[in-house]
Regions:
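Sequence/structural segment immediately N-terminal to covalent heme-attachment motifs in c-type
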Residues: 745-769, 783-797
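The canonical Cys-X-X-Cys-His
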Residues: 372, 383, 418-421, 752-766, ...
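Short beta-alpha connecting loops at secondary-structure transitions
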Residues: 209-210, 356-357, 398-406, 563, ...
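Long, ordered, helix-rich scaffold segments
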Residues: 383, 408-414, 422-754, 837, ...
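Electron-transfer interface patches adjacent to heme c in soluble/periplasmic c-type cytochromes
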Residues: 777-793, 797, 801-819, 827-832
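Flexible coil segments in periplasmic/lumen-exposed cytochrome c-class electron-transfer proteins
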Residues: 22-41, 679-680, 734-746, 808-809, ...
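Beta-propeller domains with acidic blade repeats across secreted/periplasmic ectodomains
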Residues: 17-448, 459, 469, 543
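Bacterial N-terminal signal peptides
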Residues: 2-15
Length: 865
């Protein structure tokens, strides 16, 4: 740490040194706490004073462990294997009074250290600087780190052990693009299966034999990734606090013909039953002008912008919060706690932990929790960017921008705080749960690292696994095998041992088989995944075990078996799939997991299921959808004929018609707790490769039976009409074709496609089908194809519609970018609007520049004179 920084930090550090514990928030303050005070210009609070703004449930407090200038503008953090805290600092975000993001290389990755082990960080080293709007980082063994700096994923290393990177190599291109910060690739979370999970992006990162490589995934989540003890991945998005992946994304990526991906990114929280309880009025939100959605005291009742989920797996807080979910909501100055529930079968749900009141709420509008991270001491930490602004400028409504300006909230950058969450006894003494000793994993022996896999604190287990995989010491293998086989060991330790062996390329079929026969469901499910490399080789013992587990009494084991069946040799796959789906084919999550492994084998499975006495409608519809999406003419004709057979039960025929329509339209379907394609920009594999325009699927012959159904008056008529509108055949008049685009219009269209996928598909979906309660469909939208002023006004001024707020995303785009993305949506998915030239966009923007709030649907639809 430089002398100037040290001098500035001295008062804070001396204050900490004179106390038995680091500076701490007030214990047992009245809770829930609320103040109606709303200063016209909220003051900047010194770090010590900011502690007085917090209210927590009885027994809880936060300790101040770092503050400016030691840390500034923190957005991400992670502890390394030696107990140092790495922090991504983003001073370039909203860096001026106009709240613009700087494209100058002013951001950095720093390392904080507590050199005297008093619980307060006192040293700062800049590992990497001169970064342009970085979105992610991941600490690696050997003094290295992955850094996501759009559009590049870098690996930077410190080769002389001074904690300063002196080498940098490119790992991959295409890691997001410079644009709206909250919709950029992030995460790089090292999961139990050794896959580095990336949120808001279409690929993840795999580590094999010392090398990193991108692997196909599905775009999910928005900001942050976490996992539970079983290795299930959790994410969140915008105003929805927690989603879970029951199935790994690589399964769905293997079949581009899927029309749905249930089991991936399942919503755990009922929006109608969850509430937040801020400690002060929260009108400083994008929709703060809609006072009717606030409580009488001025507080929002629903999340303003969640991020950084954390499943707490530490040991220093009480048992009732271990395994529970924490989420930050910087927009409303809270950290919310969710109670996770497992129904005993692996199906998860989440609800508010407290009926009223927040786990952590601040009366300071500048408390902006951006990241939560478990620590080696058994507690967890909160990074506070300490800014008056929390909404990315391009997404701000005019109301919010005016609110920020009037209150001076854009002033005061360069601050930042890190807090440790603690639990204390009634008299304020330290809780009986001591902090874990500081780790030294970079210097630990291989045997010591293996021993850490049995640590009760999940941080130690995760970090030790990562070090062992990267170290790849052959001496660890017998120790790991011994632990994996130890039936008396904690199941979590055995699970880590198995995945560590797999990450080292040392997984054995006998170990997978042992896990598949275990009494613990989590181990049986893991054993199925770990067996897959041997299944393709025809290992009969493993194949038999997999078929047995397809009938397991536990849902999560059956679900994994459904996905794993896809790893069987083709000849051995069809009959087990038929058997499984005949019994469980109305479970949408299991159906999609099974179909992910059926590419090329859907037709015989569908034929068998449709002929069954009690055909499972869910499986029938999704199989028909996958086959239709493949767009094979002969198969399409065959399936239309199948749906027209009057000897099949009407529900089965309806399922066939619905599935075919979904597939011909390109997917994707929502339902249940799923968010189709993922709330934040999820693409179902292959969907983005569908052609734009109104191209109907061409059948080889006139489907007269379908026309008969469509002309009927029973329940089959409507789905038949819907399907009939999506197909054509020789002799049927073609729909009006779009005029050819000029070279400049084509360039505009292509550029718009890129912008749309990056910034719009999160809500409206890749195929423009929209999402219920989130965003309306753009495919077939009259407003999209209306006179140019309508879509321009919606994109640049925003729209307050029946579903909710469309933010003025286009306000941060130049005229050409607005023209490009609108040209793309106006000429895709059957839309027939004309291209929009940048000059027209400029004209309409100027005409409606006086608007200060998003327009209403009535305003937008009113004719302009």
């Amino acid at each position: 740490m430089g002398a100037a920084v040290a001098a500035l930090a001295a008062p804070l550090l001396l204050a900490a040194a004179n106390l038995a514990v680091p500076p701490r928030s007030e214990l047992n303050r009245p809770w829930p706490f609320f103040t109606a005070e709303e200063p016209e210009e909220p003051p900047l609070r010194a770090p010590i004073d900011a502690l007085n703004s917090f209210a927590m449930p009885p027994g809880y407090a936060v300790e101040l462990v770092a503050a400016e200038p030691l840390v500034q503008d923190p957005i991400l953090m992670e502890f390394d294997g030696d107990g140092r805290l790495w922090v991504m600092e983003l001073p370039g975000w909203a860096h001026n009074l106009s709240m613009e993001n700087s494209l100058e290389p002013v951001n950095r990755l720093v390392v904080l250290d507590d050199t005297d082990n008093d619980g307060v960080f006192d040293n700062r080293t800049v590992f990497a600087d001169k970064l342009v709007l970085p979105r992610a980082f991941k600490i690696l063994a050997g003094g290295c780190a992955l850094i996501g700096e759009p559009p590049t994923l870098w690996k930077a290393c410190d080769t002389d052990r001074d904690l300063k990177a002196d080498t940098k190599e490119k790992v991959a291109d295409g890691f997001a693009r410079l644009g709206v910060l909250e919709h950029g690739a992030n995460g790089l979370f090292w999961g139990m299966d050794n896959l580095l999970v990336v949120s808001e992006h279409e690929w993840n990162v795999a580590y094999k034999a010392g090398q990193f490589a991108t692997v196909p995934g599905l775009r999910r989540g928005q900001w942050g990734v976490t996992q539970d003890d079983a290795g299930r991945i959790y994410r969140n998005v915008n105003t929805d606090p927690l989603f879970v992946d029951y199935v790994s994304p690589d399964y769905y990526a293997r079949n581009p013909d899927l029309v749905r991906t249930r089991g991936l990114y399942e919503n755990l929280v009922d929006q109608e039953k969850t509430n937040i309880w801020p400690a002060h009025p929260t009108f400083g939100l994008n929709r703060g002008y809609r006072r009717e959605v606030f409580r009488a005291d001025g507080t929002a009742s629903y999340y303003g912008g969640v991020s950084s989920p954390l499943i707490y797996r530490g040991t220093r807080l009480p048992a009732d919060v271990q395994g529970m979910g924490f989420v930050a909501d910087g927009a409303t100055n809270i950290v919310h706690l969710l109670r996770l529930k497992d129904d005993g079968q692996g199906r998860m749900a989440a609800e508010d932990f407290y009926a009223k009141g927040e786990f952590l709420a601040s009366t300071d509008v500048r408390f902006r929790p951006t990241a939560l991270a478990g620590g080696p001491d058994g507690s967890f930490y909160v990074a506070d960017m300490y800014r008056g602004v929390s909404q990315d400028g391009p997404l701000q409504t005019d109301y919010l921008r005016d609110y920020i300006t009037k209150r001076g909230l854009a002033r005061g950058i360069g601050h930042g705080r890190i807090y440790r969450v603690v639990h204390v006894s009634a008299n304020g003494a330290a809780a009986p749960m001591p902090r874990d000793a500081r780790p030294q994993m970079s210097r630990d022996t291989t045997a010591a690292l293996v021993a850490h896999l049995s640590h009760p604190n999940g941080w130690w287990r995760d970090t030790a696994q990562q070090h062992l995989v990267q170290r790849a010491d052959p001496k660890s293998e017998p120790l790991l095998v011994k632990l994996a086989k130890d039936l008396k060991a904690d199941w979590r330790s055995r699970l880590h041992a198995l995945w560590t062996l797999d990450g080292m390329g040392a997984m054995r079929a006998d170990l997978a088989l042992l896990a598949m026969r275990d009494a613990k469901a989590e181990l049986r499910a893991a054993g199925l995944r770990l067996a897959e490399s041997s299944l393709a080789k025809g290992d009969q013992k493993l194949i038999k075990a997999v078929l047995t587990l397809a009938g397991d009494g536990n849902w999560q084991v059956r679900l994994q078996a459904a996905a794993t069946l896809g790893a069987l040799p083709d000849a051995a796959r069809t009959q087990p799939m038929i058997a499984l789906l005949s019994v469980h084919g109305d479970d949408p999550v299991l159906v999609d997991a099974a179909l992910s492994g059926l590419k090329g084998n859907e037709l015989p499975v569908l034929t068998a299921l449709a002929a069954a006495r009690a055909a499972p409608r869910e499986a029938v519809a999704m199989l028909a959808g996958a086959l239709a999406k493949r767009r094979d003419a002969a198969t399409g004709q065959q399936l239309v004929a199948l749906a027209a057979r009057d000897d099949l039960p009407a529900p089965v025929r309806t399922a066939l018609l619905d599935g075919l329509a979904l597939g011909f339209a390109g997917g994707a379907q929502t339902g249940g707790n799923a968010v189709a394609g993922g709330r934040a920009g999820g693409n179902i594999p292959g969907v983005s490769r569908q052609r734009g325009g109104g191209n109907r699927f061409e059948l080889p012959a006139d489907p007269r039976s379908l026309a008969v159904l469509a002309a009927g008056k029973d329940a089959l008529a409507e789905p038949a009409k819907k399907l009939l509108a999506l197909v054509t055949w020789p002799g049927r008049p073609a729909p009006p074709a779009l005029p050819p685009r000029s070279a400049s219009e084509e360039a505009l269209f292509r550029r718009g496609q890129s912008i749309y996928v990056e910034q719009c598909s999160g809500c409206h979906q890749v195929q423009g089908q929209g999402q219920a309660t989130v965003a309306p469909p753009l495919a077939g939208s009259k407003r999209v194809a209306a006179n140019g002023d309508v879509p321009v006004r919606i994109l640049t001024n925003g729209l307050e519609g029946k579903i909710g707020l469309m933010p003025p995303l286009g306000s941060a785009m130049n005229d050409e970018e607005v023209a490009a993305v609108l040209t793309y949506v106006r000429q895709s998915w059957g839309n027939t609007g004309t291209p929009l030239p940048p000059a027209a966009v400029k004209e309409w923007r100027l005409a409606f520049a006086h608007r200060t709030t998003p327009g209403s649907e009535k305003d937008i639809d009113a004719p302009q004179r």
